[in-house]
Amino acid sequence: MEFEYRKVEPNHRDFQSLIAELNLSLRQITNDTGESSFVSDAFEPSKDGCIVMYLNDSAVACGVFRYHESEVCELKRMYSNKAGAGSYLLKQLECFAIEKGYRKAILSTRRVNSKAVTFYCRHSYSESSAYGKYVGVDRSICFSKTLVI
């Protein structure tokens, strides 16, 4: 199984198709699509990154990072519908973020989304202080990781 990836913008049709799948999945898990946490029109190509993963020319995973503060990016809208694609995607997003000068990645997910929580822990993300709109929101859990150069 050999994955390929493409750096795209959030309006790319394959990204949009995968995000529709993500929204359905999140609604089933959390009763919320999470759409309000990411506005694709706010995507700034000089600071942000968006990747779609492919297997045999079929889009199987996607994710975004966006500027949070100096040297810190926030991972958003991570989704995979193929075993193994999520790990490869995360690595590519981290490498892309490093290319853009980021040294740390942060993210938030719902505590009830145990699959996501386990995934991030398995990839060396540690629980961290809540940030931004997640401060005081008990249903959310925030993670961070120092990006290795």
Language-model features: where?
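Short, glycine/charged-enriched secondary-structure capping and boundary segments
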Residues: 20-21, 119-122
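Short glycine/proline-centered loop/turn elements that form peptide/ligand docking sites
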Residues: 86, 90, 113-116, 133-139
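Acetyl-CoA-dependent GNAT
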Residues: 3-76, 80-81, 90-91, 96, ...
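Conserved catalytic-core motifs of GNAT/GCN5-like acyltransferases
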Residues: 10, 106-109, 121-142
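A generic structural signal for beta-strand entry/edge sites
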Residues: 70-72, 104, 140
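Short amphipathic helical patch at the helix-1/turn junction of helix-turn-helix
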Residues: 80, 110-111
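Conserved GNAT acetyl-CoA-binding A-motif
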Residues: 97-109
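Short glycine-rich hinge loops at helix-strand junctions in the catalytic core
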Residues: 84, 88, 101, 122-124
